[in-house]
């Protein structure tokens, strides 16, 4: 079976594990994009520590869950967004103003929409978390 979207799979795995009440989850296959998304989620307090475990294949991320995620998902298609248009996308994907984050892939790396707005740069929407 082919895995079409590893990021969407990882985020749904995290969301489902949170709902069941698990304290940690193993995400595979690992990728740089998933690692950067986990870093942003950790920065905003949605997850605890995470680490990369090399299993001789693609690798695995071990993620500590804190029980703070209501929903996390990948945004498909990866919409391009300009620096001044973040509010429109917040209304579409987040339940309330300043509640949750959009994760954006920019020319300066993966970051939240709040950081990208402060820096005045656009990018592509890849995920949301609240």
UniProtKB/Swiss-Prot annotation:
| A GO term for molecular function | rRNA binding
**Which BP terms from GO are recorded?**
translation
This protein's record includes keyword Ribonucleoprotein = yes
Cite a GO CC annotation.
ribosome
Query: Which keywords, in A-to-Z order, does the entry hold?
Result: Ribonucleoprotein, Ribosomal protein, RNA-binding, rRNA-binding
Q: Which family does it belong to?
A: Belongs to the universal ribosomal protein uS8 family.
Please give the function described in this protein's UniProt entry. One of the primary rRNA binding proteins, it binds directly to 16S rRNA central domain where it helps coordinate assembly of the platform of the 30S subunit.
Q: Which PANTHER family match?
A: 40S RIBOSOMAL PROTEIN S15A (PTHR11758)
Q: Subunit structure of this entry?
A: Part of the 30S ribosomal subunit.
Q: What is this protein called?
A: Small ribosomal subunit protein uS8
The lineage is: Archaea, Methanobacteriati, Methanobacteriota, Thermococci, Thermococcales
Q: Which gene encodes it?
A: rps8
